[in-house]
Amino acid sequence: SRINVKLKSIDGTEINGQGPEIPEKKVKELMKQLSALGEGDVLFLAGSIPSSMADDAYQKIMEMLDGKGVRIVVDATRDLLMKVLPYHPFLIKPNNHELGEIFGVELKTRESVVPYAKQLQKKGAQNVLVSMAGEGAVLVAASGEVFEAPAPKGKLINGVGAGDSMVAGFMAGYMEKEDYLHAFHMGIAAGSASAFSENLATREEIASVYEQITK
């Protein structure tokens, strides 16, 4: 694996190590394991692809699983994200800056995010969840609904892992009720609760934020 160092501060600093060389044998073992996924399973593809692997690794994985009923979540940026859209990922989660970079625009408000999130949906994404830090979040759902919410009230302590927590919270909420609004609120609650705590949030902390945003 590799060692990543996160310096916890308001601005946040990350010192990320270079990933290891992954031999072809290990890549084949991974693909064999992933091929066993099926109906009802959820697969998260997040971050950059190791330099020793083909840059179309995500596409190959999604192509292999196409039609098997696996819900695939992709948390990646720019070209890596755009290349997987034809494979219809269940969820993608760019932030407003990443979304703006794709289209060459600056997106500062929730309202401005919506048309660009819809463009990603037209290109193949089923659900587009856009995080906006202090501005809140937007969900353009597969149902055709659009949900917006301001950021919950709380003191920002540690932003490390907040985005990952948001994605996990959304999927946990969706798997619980298969309701997009509930999933959206769970995503916001999990991401915000983690940002409000020294470490990843507890179930109780997430529940407290969820209650705040659903009153």
State where each predicted segment sits.
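Conserved phosphate-binding/catalytic region of the ribokinase-like
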Residues: 63-64, 110-215
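A general structural signal for well-ordered alpha-helical segments in protein cores
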Residues: 2, 27, 58, 96-99, ...
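Short, charged, surface-exposed secondary-structure boundary motifs
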Residues: 25, 101-107, 156-160
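Conserved phosphate/ATP/ADP-binding segment of small-molecule kinases
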Residues: 55-143
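Conserved N-terminal subdomain of the carbohydrate kinase-like
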Residues: 1-41, 208-215
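Short beta-strands and strand-loop turn motifs
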Residues: 14-16, 40-48, 75, 93-98
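Hydrophobic alpha-helical segments and helix pairs
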Residues: 21-62, 71
